[in-house]
A protein has these predicted regions:
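Glycan-processing catalytic domains of CAZymes
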Residues: 1-220
Length: 220
């Protein structure tokens, strides 16, 4: 079990969280960098510094890119990736808000091919739900659940086709987890066929502003 860590807080606002993440970087699957709902229009020196420290610690860095469920122009997505690569030396990309329907699959396939050609070594898709089966073959990792802990424990269902895929291809991102139940959230993700997870205690509108306590649990 490894952790995908989207930490959406500026290093100047919570330097302690970034320091802890750098210390634990080797125990993560990847870290999602999101300076400004994407790379922003200019390099951010604070993010440049933490990105350099994370790389030195052995982390895999993914640049956050919003796809707007297939409505965003592919050239804009490509430019976001290039900025992440130039400014923060991102290894790949975290494609957020991707489509999940069979009808959106061809366009998503073209998008993944285009970011691969641009040098994205790791591609993570985040539809936030179980997509049509073909999506899982496009990316290195697919987020098949993003939502609140209460929903995760009461309304999660797993399509049969996922059992035919390696668990290393799936990730569950769960927020609103009571801190005492974070180890349970990690175990539950594993039992539900996701070898990668990211349980956090934070709540909307930005639950990812806090570092996952699971990193501390892994030290024990």
């Amino acid at each position: 079990m490894t952790l995908l860590v989207p930490l959406y807080v500026h290093p100047a606002e919570d330097p302690g969280a970034w320091h802890r993440l750098i210390t634990a970087a080797a125990r993560t699957y990847a870290i999602v960098l999101n300076p400004a709902n994407g790379p922003g229009t200019d390099p951010d020196r604070a993010f440049t510094a933490v990105a350099e420290a994370l790389r030195a610690a052995g982390a895999r860095l993914l640049g956050y890119v919003d796809t707007d469920y297939g409505h965003r122009d592919r050239a804009e997505i490509a430019e976001d990736l290039r900025r992440h690569q130039r400014w923060y030396a991102a290894d790949g990309c975290f494609l957020d808000r991707v489509t999940a329907t069979p009808g959106g699959l061809p366009a998503c396939r073209r998008l993944v091919r285009s970011v691969r050609r641009l040098g994205a070594r790791t591609v993570v898709l985040n539809p936030g739900v179980h997509p049509a089966p073909g999506y899982a073959r496009l990316a290195d990792l697919t987020v098949t659940f993003e939502g609140h802990w209460s929903t995760y424990v009461s309304a999660f269902s797993r399509p049969r086709w996922t059992a035919r895929q390696p668990s290393e291809r799936f990730c569950h991102l769960v927020y609103g987890v009571p801190e005492a139940l974070v180890p349970l959230a990690v175990r539950t993700a594993h039992e539900r066929g996701a070898a990668v997870c990211g349980p956090v205690t934070g709540e909307p509108p930005n639950p990812w502003a806090e570092l996952t306590p699971a990193l501390t649990e892994m030290e024990r």
